Amino acid sequence: MGCKLKVCFFKPESDLNPVAVERYEANILGCTRQFRYSTANTNTIDMALSVNGIPVVALELKNQFTGQDYICAINQYKNDRSSKEFAFHLNHRFLVYFAVDLYEVWMTTQLADSNTRFLPFNQGSNGAGVTGGAGNPQNPNGYATSYLWEEVLQRDSLLDLIHRFISFVKEKEEVVKNGVSRMVTKEKMIFPRYHQYDVVRKLMADVRRNGAGKNYLIQHSAGSGKSNSIAWTAYRLASVHDADGNGLFDSVIVVTNRVVLDSQLSLIHISEPTRLRCISY
């Protein structure tokens, strides 16, 4: 037996329900320096962000002026942050772990000691949505990585990420051992890469501003997560409202040759009163 508690209230699509707006504004977001995560040692994470007292984002911060960079932070996660700690168990506390220096941001959603896999969370050398190389553009007004705390981890954005992007999924996968094949269930947390976060939010902002009827061309390279971007966009379009609180779309139809999209839509579970299903012809 158990009792389900709602520990966070998310931003409603419109202001028509004042109670929903009040509950959203009552969320308490915190920032803790040198966050102690264990009762077995005195190790700390440089910074932890919490929502209503629950730690959800971990950041290890390094800077080149002291001879350290994001690689040092990644090694710290791999070697000094035991995956056996309760706070680091998948889907228990932290949802994402960032390794940050003055020029680059990398992230992972699951600590697995030396097997931890980090991915870049950078804008690209010429900025978001502009063709370029790896890394981030120079920032004349601050650090090259300041977009992380000035934009991505800003209050509304962080709650939006938790609400509409981050997903805990279970996938069946075939494993062959000693010539014997069997299906196993693997769990993982899905967190958008920066280009996915950026394109979905830009699309939604333009739709709210201009309504239906516009065409958009989105450039995605191979292996960049097109299916997830489509799924996130489809779910959000199904519930988007204009400035007057009116729903913009009655239905969302996705036409694609990506046969995996049906499973992607099922995996990207968003806590919205919408249901999407793929149909084939």
In which residue ranges do the predicted regions lie?
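Conserved H-loop
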Residues: 257
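ATP-dependent helicase/translocase motor core
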Residues: 1-251, 260, 264-271
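Single conserved hydrophobic/aromatic residue that forms the stacking wall/gate
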Residues: 268-281
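Conserved SAM-binding loop
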Residues: 254
